[in-house]
Every structure is written in structure tokens, then in C-alpha cells.
């Protein structure tokens, strides 16, 4: 999934901003640190499939949109 991480991060940021959520908002919903969300958006961190599903659920979108 490493090659797809930057695309995932770009989509995550795009959807988060459309929903007017901060990285802090998303991190609180998921119970993770804000820097983790930042790392995902920058492509510095690789999310597991479970994490992708949790993020999709938190944002109210289908996980397929993110990956």
C-alpha cells in the first residue's frame, strides 16, 4: 500500500476539509493523536485496512473512496 499512501492522504485531506473538520477533530473521533492524521495526509504513515475503514466511517464515506 506504500505507493498508494500519498493518494490516500490527499483524499483524506480533501474529504476532511469538505466536511469542515480539522485534523484534531478527526483524531478525537478516532481516538488517535493529531500527528498520526497529519502523517497519513502527508503520506509519511501507512494506514492498515482497519484504520482506513475506521477513518471512512468517521468521515461518513465508503472506504473505497479513500483507497
Kindly give the residue locations of the regions a language model identified.
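A short, Lys/Arg-rich alpha-helix, primarily the initiator
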Residues: 1-18
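Residues within the helices of the helix-turn-helix
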Residues: 13, 24, 53
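The alpha-helix within a helix-turn-helix
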Residues: 16, 27, 56
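Residue-level detection of the helix-turn-helix DNA-binding "recognition helix"
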Residues: 17, 31, 42, 53
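Short alpha-helical DNA-recognition segment
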Residues: 21-39
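DNA major-groove recognition helix of helix-turn-helix/homeodomain DNA-binding modules
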Residues: 50-65
Amino acid at each position: 500500500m506504500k505507493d498508494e499512501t500519498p493518494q490516500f492522504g490527499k483524499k483524506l485531506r480533501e474529504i476532511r476539509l469538505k466536511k469542515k473538520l480539522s485534523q484534531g477533530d478527526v483524531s478525537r473521533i478516532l481516538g488517535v493523536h493529531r500527528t498520526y492524521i497529519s502523517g497519513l495526509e502527508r503520506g509519511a504513515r501507512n494506514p492498515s485496512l482497519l484504520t482506513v475503514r475506521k477513518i471512512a466511517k468517521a468521515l461518513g464515506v465508503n472506504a473505497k473512496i479513500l483507497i
